[in-house]
């Protein structure tokens, strides 16, 4: 355990009732009764960057940015759960009908923003 200097007990935070010492007597600083951890995600994407154009999938791809068509740029997910810009993937599929990341046959699972 830790060394205690000058006879003082270290303050111990506890989630259950019990004696925990502090500098000002036997009072606890606080007692944690209940804690609910919450996590939220803004989208369900394993990788947030398009592996073809290297731009974030929630932003427009380079081609749509150049042609000023940001609203038309949507994300496409394959059955392998990898996501890409639909514009990028449609060009990729013309040359190679496999996912650029895992090399599985490319089958569209869903398209959306």
Swiss-Prot record:
Location of the protein in the cell: Cytoplasm; Nucleus
Binding site for Zn(2+) 3: 61, 64, 73, 87
Catalytic reaction annotation: S-ubiquitinyl-[E2 ubiquitin-conjugating enzyme]-L-cysteine + [acceptor protein]-L-lysine = [E2 ubiquitin-conjugating enzyme]-L-cysteine + N(6)-ubiquitinyl-[acceptor protein]-L-lysine; S-[NEDD8-protein]-yl-[E2 NEDD8-conjugating enzyme]-L-cysteine + [cullin]-L-lysine = [E2 NEDD8-conjugating enzyme]-L-cysteine + N(6)-[NEDD8-protein]-yl-[cullin]-L-lysine
Pathway(s) of this molecule: Protein modification; protein ubiquitination; Protein modification; protein neddylation
GO biological process terms on file: apoptotic mitochondrial changes; cerebral cortex radially oriented cell migration; intrinsic apoptotic signaling pathway in response to oxidative stress; negative regulation of apoptotic process; proteasome-mediated ubiquitin-dependent protein catabolic process; protein neddylation; protein ubiquitination; radial glia guided migration of Purkinje cell
Keywords annotated in UniProt: Acetylation, Cytoplasm, Metal-binding, Nucleus, Transferase, Ubl conjugation pathway, Zinc, Zinc-finger
Pfam families associated with the record: zf-rbx1
Entry EC no(s): 2.3.2.27, 2.3.2.32
Residues annotated for Zn(2+) 1 binding in this entry: 50, 53, 85, 88
Binding site residues for Zn(2+) 2: 80, 82, 99, 102
Main location: cytoplasm
Entry-annotated residues carrying N-acetylalanine: 2
PROSITE patterns, A to Z: ZF_RING_2
GO MF entries: cullin family protein binding; NEDD8 ligase activity; ubiquitin protein ligase activity; zinc ion binding
UniProt keyword annotation of Zinc-finger present: yes
Comment, domains: The RING-type zinc finger domain is essential for ubiquitin ligase activity. It coordinates an additional third zinc ion.
Family, as annotated: Belongs to the RING-box family.
Described purpose of this protein according to its UniProt entry: Catalytic component of multiple cullin-5-RING E3 ubiquitin-protein ligase complexes (ECS complexes), which mediate the ubiquitination and subsequent proteasomal degradation of target proteins. It is thereby involved in various biological processes, such as cell cycle progression, signal transduction and transcription. The functional specificity of the E3 ubiquitin-protein ligase ECS complexes depend on the variable SOCS box-containing substrate recognition component.
Protein name, UniProt field: RING-box protein 2
Gene expressing this chain: Rnf7
């Amino acid at each position: 355990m830790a060394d205690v200097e000058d006879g003082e007990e270290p303050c111990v935070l506890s989630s259950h009732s019990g004696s925990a010492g502090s500098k000002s007597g036997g009072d606890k600083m606080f007692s944690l009764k209940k804690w609910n951890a919450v996590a939220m995600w803004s989208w369900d994407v394993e990788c947030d960057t398009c592996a073809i154009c290297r731009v974030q999938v929630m932003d427009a791809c380079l081609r749509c940015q150049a042609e000023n068509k940001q609203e038309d740029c949507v994300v496409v997910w394959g059955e392998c759960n990898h996501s890409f810009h639909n514009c990028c993937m449609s060009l990729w599929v013309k040359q190679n009908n496999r996912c650029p990341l895992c090399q599985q046959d490319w089958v569209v699972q869903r398209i959306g923003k």
